């Protein structure tokens, strides 16, 4: 439940940077709010095979289901598709001398990771997501 200082407009969660800093761990804040990337093979969900739903660590928005998760060997949790297409936004990212597609939470605009066209079927996509941006709700 949002606190009194959290604004929700058109299903968007808007908080001050001070609120985000209070509510998120340092690594969650760095990833979700500052677009950082956790070190490969360091995230808690990279090798987690439990069944469940992955939600945004910032706002609880449903993002990915465990049945879409696969081991890509890249060092981050990878998914073939979002649980609900409209729950993620994509933006062109030209940082670090690369052209990539950034994946963001559609509800709080938190940085999740990137999507690449080199995944397995059925989509051929690899959503490469930072563990720090996620919380697993086990089934």
From Swiss-Prot:
<feature type="domain" description="MsrB">
    <location>
        <begin position="17"/>
        <end position="139"/>
    </location>
</feature>
<keyword id="KW-0560">Oxidoreductase</keyword>
<dbReference type="GO" id="GO:0005737">
    <property type="term" value="C:cytoplasm"/>
</dbReference>
<dbReference type="GO" id="GO:0008270">
    <property type="term" value="F:zinc ion binding"/>
</dbReference>
<dbReference type="Pfam" id="PF01641">
    <property type="entry name" value="SelR"/>
</dbReference>
<feature type="active site" description="Nucleophile">
    <location>
        <position position="128"/>
    </location>
</feature>
<keyword id="KW-0862">Zinc</keyword>
<dbReference type="GO" id="GO:0033743">
    <property type="term" value="F:peptide-methionine (R)-S-oxide reductase activity"/>
</dbReference>
<dbReference type="GO" id="GO:0030091">
    <property type="term" value="P:protein repair"/>
</dbReference>
<protein>
    <recommendedName>
        <fullName>Peptide methionine sulfoxide reductase MsrB</fullName>
        <ecNumber>1.8.4.12</ecNumber>
    </recommendedName>
</protein>
<feature type="binding site">
    <location>
        <position position="108"/>
    </location>
    <ligand>
        <name>Zn(2+)</name>
    </ligand>
</feature>
<comment type="similarity">
    <text>Belongs to the MsrB Met sulfoxide reductase family.</text>
</comment>
<dbReference type="InterPro" id="IPR011057">
    <property type="entry name" value="Mss4-like_sf"/>
</dbReference>
<keyword id="KW-0479">Metal-binding</keyword>
<dbReference type="GO" id="GO:0006979">
    <property type="term" value="P:response to oxidative stress"/>
</dbReference>
<feature type="binding site">
    <location>
        <position position="105"/>
    </location>
    <ligand>
        <name>Zn(2+)</name>
    </ligand>
</feature>
<feature type="binding site">
    <location>
        <position position="56"/>
    </location>
    <ligand>
        <name>Zn(2+)</name>
    </ligand>
</feature>
<feature type="binding site">
    <location>
        <position position="59"/>
    </location>
    <ligand>
        <name>Zn(2+)</name>
    </ligand>
</feature>
<dbReference type="InterPro" id="IPR028427">
    <property type="entry name" value="Met_Sox_Rdtase_MsrB"/>
</dbReference>
<dbReference type="InterPro" id="IPR002579">
    <property type="entry name" value="Met_Sox_Rdtase_MsrB_dom"/>
</dbReference>
